[in-house]
Amino acid sequence: MHRLMGVNSTAAAAAGQPNVSCTCNCKRSLFQSMEITELEFVQIIIIVVVMMVMVVVITCLLSHYKLSARSFISRHSQGRRREDALSSEGCLWPSESTVSGNGIPEPQVYAPPRPTDRLAVPPFAQRERFHRFQPTYPYLQHEIDLPPTISLSDGEEPPPYQGPCTLQLRDPEQQLELNRESVRAPPNRTIFDSDLMDSARLGGPCPPSSNSGISATCYGSGGRMEGPPPTYSEVIGHYPGSSFQHQQSSGPPSLLEGTRLHHTHIAPLESAAIWSKEKDKQKGHPL
């Protein structure tokens, strides 16, 4: 009996074990399924939120670009209307010319039609655009505000070299004095062979301080000229071409006479000096 009771108890215990384990597994599966469903719900919510944010961003971008495109189109249309208004007001461009009955070509003027929706443009903007797009020559030559070109001299040039300037910057007397002083001889002194001969004959050369500012033709000895030298205008005349050569060939009579006297006076002295040099050469180098 006890054995049978033990067997029954063990069988009952064995039969009762699967029921207990089954209840425990069911509870665990329920917890796992609940966690899985919660995770899926959170993922779905996150996906929905991201999609909504994307939609909002896309709509904002589209609206922004649409507004910018509208503003660009409106600006372009306003610019075209403004150009049409300006061309209808002032820009009358000459087109192909037609020959009239007399044979004289007559230019045809093209005037574009005035638009109905004209915009109010300030006059300075119209003038600026008109000057920018229209050629300056020969249509607007009278409207170019350029100063006149005047060639001004400083008044220091002698008469043959003055340009086409008619503006008198100084008094006539002052101008004549400037012209006379501007052609004076330089302060240095030109020395010729005749001066050396005269100085040797008269007893030595003169100090250079006594001859400073005076040219070689201004001495009073030996039939030379005295006083200041002739002015540049007197020498060259009004035409610096052939008249200068003619005056140079003719020259003042006193100057020519003085040079002739010097040449006739120097000729025998030069011949004597040459003869003495040849004699010395023959003595030093015998053949």
From Swiss-Prot:
Any GO BP: negative regulation of transforming growth factor beta receptor signaling pathway
Family per record: Belongs to the PMEPA1 family.
Lumenal compartment spans: 1-40
Organism per entry: Homo sapiens
Region (Disordered): 239-258
Key words of the record: Endosome, Golgi apparatus, Membrane, Repeat, Signal transduction inhibitor, Transmembrane, Transmembrane helix, Ubl conjugation pathway
Record topology, Cytoplasmic segments: 64-287
Sequence intervals crossing the membrane: 41-63
Functional summary from the UniProt entry: Functions as a negative regulator of TGF-beta signaling and thereby probably plays a role in cell proliferation, differentiation, apoptosis, motility, extracellular matrix production and immunosuppression. In the canonical TGF-beta pathway, ZFYVE9/SARA recruits the intracellular signal transducer and transcriptional modulators SMAD2 and SMAD3 to the TGF-beta receptor. Phosphorylated by the receptor, SMAD2 and SMAD3 then form a heteromeric complex with SMAD4 that translocates to the nucleus to regulate transcription.
Protein name: Protein TMEPAI
Bias kind Polar residues: ranges: 242-252
Principal subcellular localisation of the protein: membrane
Location in or out of the cell: Early endosome membrane; Golgi apparatus membrane
Domain free text: The PPxY motifs mediate interaction with NEDD4. The SMAD interaction motif is required for interaction with SMAD2 and SMAD3 and the negative regulation of TGF-beta signaling.
Motif window: SMAD interaction motif (SIM): 186-189
Tissue: Highest expression in prostate. Also expressed in ovary.
Motif PPxY motif 1, chain ranges: 158-161
Topology class, membrane: Single-pass membrane protein
Gene Ontology, cellular component aspect: early endosome membrane; endosome membrane; Golgi membrane; intracellular membrane-bounded organelle; membrane; plasma membrane
Name of encoding gene: PMEPA1
Conditions for induction: Up-regulated by androgen and TGF-beta (at protein level).
Motif PPxY motif 2: positions: 229-232
Keyword Transcription carried by entry: no
Subunit structure: Interacts with NEDD4 (via PPxY motifs). Interacts with AR. Interacts with LDLRAD4. Interacts (via the SMAD interaction motif) with SMAD2 and SMAD3.
